[in-house]
């Protein structure tokens, strides 16, 4: 597993995400409804739904709102046929970018995604152009803990890898289907999970300087502002020194 901190990338974007929480909630609800519609409302038997619930909780969505979304999905939703679509491309500095969308209209979605790449000096690629650089994983963050005890609990629960970061936080990687099981396994013995999500982990990283980093962040902002875009993944790495200049 690459030795970078995925959570560092999440943290430096959190303020911007908080500013558009309403749009984030809309996207989370769309995923909850779709996951329940496709796989049923039992989180124990539906890994996609469990991952959606964990992500919603990490974003402070109430249980009541989550349950209503699941009930909508089990009841068939609103009749629209939402499909997951993955677009791949290259961003500033030669970064690899994957865009996960949930949409009922492919033409509308591509008309949102393609201009974002073009305006930021990137280009949309073909299927498979950068996907091979990423692995779908579950990622759990524990801010600080007894490293040995947490490692033992995580391995016992089925974790694939554990990484301790410089700030003392611990990142736990799992098979994406096992995210909920591992999260439960470490919480039941007393560890507090700060964040749990299914994500795409890059196998190699591209270091970004103070000139290129803002361009990539602008691309991510533009993509995340598209209604059909659920998640944006990339392999750009922004050091603490560069982040301090942004």
Curated annotation (Swiss-Prot):
Cellular compartment(s): Cytoplasm
Gene Ontology MF terms: DNA binding
Superkingdom of source: Bacteria
One of the record's GO cellular component terms: cytosol
Gene3D superfamilies in UniProt: 1.10.10.200, 3.30.70.980
Primary localization class, coarse: cytoplasm
Any one of the GO BP annotations: regulation of DNA-templated transcription
A Pfam family reported for this protein in Swiss-Prot or TrEMBL: Transcrip_reg
UniProt keyword list: Cytoplasm, DNA-binding, Transcription, Transcription regulation
The family this protein is said to belong to: Belongs to the TACO1 family.
Protein name (record): Probable transcriptional regulatory protein HS_0508
